[in-house]
Amino acid sequence: MDKVKLERMKNDKGFIAALDQSGGSTPKALAAYGVPETAYSNEKEMFDLVHAMRTRIITGKAFNSNNILGAILFEQTMEREIEGMPTADFLWEKKKILPFLKVDKGLADLKDGVQLMKPIPNLDAMLKHAVEKHIFGTKMRSVIKEANPKGIKAVVDQQFELGIQIAKAGLVPIIEPEVDIKSPDKAKCEEILKKELEEHLKTLPKDLLVMFKLSIPTKENLYEEFTKHPQVVRVVALSGGYSRDDANKLLAKNRGMIASFSRALAEGLFASQSDAEFNATLEKTIKGVYEASIT
């Protein structure tokens, strides 16, 4: 593990930009950007358009290391180039922003009040390739909808099992057990989740590091102790369906937690904007998310 990169992720101010919408969520992301489904006729054209959108964000002046520590990429984005360089290399070498790779293959059906991750075939090969591509860490998401202890334990078991495999490959896994913000039992889910995360950290091999990506908790500073744990590099928050302003306000109340927003980051950006308008909007967004992340 590169000490310079690790120190940057652990100690510097800023947030993580999530640019990892995958196949299923790409049409939605493009539509929000003002690109209708009629603008493309196949998957290749769709991914070309979304890469153009991501390139526009990443090459934006405001998308810089003063505000942003890392960026989470979809596998296709990792395989592509920005200004003639592989995306991950462009991020680190030109911007000093750490690249992360989304590794999960989506969610399984609801069972015991949760959605586990679908199996990830060829994970070892993907991790080996990610290391070759100079990726720093990974991200994988499960969802908790009900305060079911059995289900929540299964989510954290799966996340840590894969997280250990990822950490052993030389990457820093972002463990993301999202609590659905619409859950009527949200606070209860979070209490159970916190206990499970504590238990799993106790048995995490001492030479391995993880990160947590969590819904902004109902009880302020619920996860603060994790921000001080020697094996937790960083605790980041997902926006989870809140508007950007609401997510920023709620995040600012949680010490040590930084943002990792995707939809909230792209809010207000449109394909039709001039570069000046696009960059001004991006700068304003980044400033707001950054401010909420340094409290």
From Swiss-Prot:
GO molecular function ontology, one term from the record: fructose-bisphosphate aldolase activity
Catalytic reaction(s) noted: beta-D-fructose 1,6-bisphosphate = D-glyceraldehyde 3-phosphate + dihydroxyacetone phosphate
Active site positions, chain numbering: E176, K213
Keyword Acetylation: no
Listed InterPro entries: Aldolase_TIM, FBA_I, FBA_I_Gram+-type
SUPFAM superfamilies: Aldolase (SSF51569)
Keywords: Glycolysis, Lyase, Schiff base
Pathway info: Carbohydrate degradation; glycolysis; D-glyceraldehyde 3-phosphate and glycerone phosphate from D-glucose: step 4/4
E.C. number: 4.1.2.13
One Pfam family of this chain: Glycolytic
Entry's Gene Ontology BP terms: glycolytic process
Enzyme class name: lyase
Alphabetized Gene3D superfamilies for the sequence: Aldolase class I (3.20.20.70)
Keyword Lyase: yes
Family: Belongs to the class I fructose-bisphosphate aldolase family.
Protein name: Fructose-bisphosphate aldolase class 1
